């Protein structure tokens, strides 16, 4: 799967910027409060080829660099169904994203 980025500064004429590789089933995403990291849930459907069951971490400040992947419980038969950052966890989410990059 891919994440497609658009420039929406002119909403009536969105401009395609780039496609960033994620994983099979790239679906929901959430932006960190500082707008640096994009977390992408990769589980569109629980079907072969439609669900990697991971979360891709993308650094938008570095031109859409894929930092890595967060493993979920796919091996145990679970897939993420939605993704969100909780208010009290913003700092921890940014910290974890920066650790994935190391």
Give the residues covered by each predicted segment:
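Predominantly soluble domains enriched in secretory-pathway, periplasmic, or organellar proteins
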Residues: 1-102
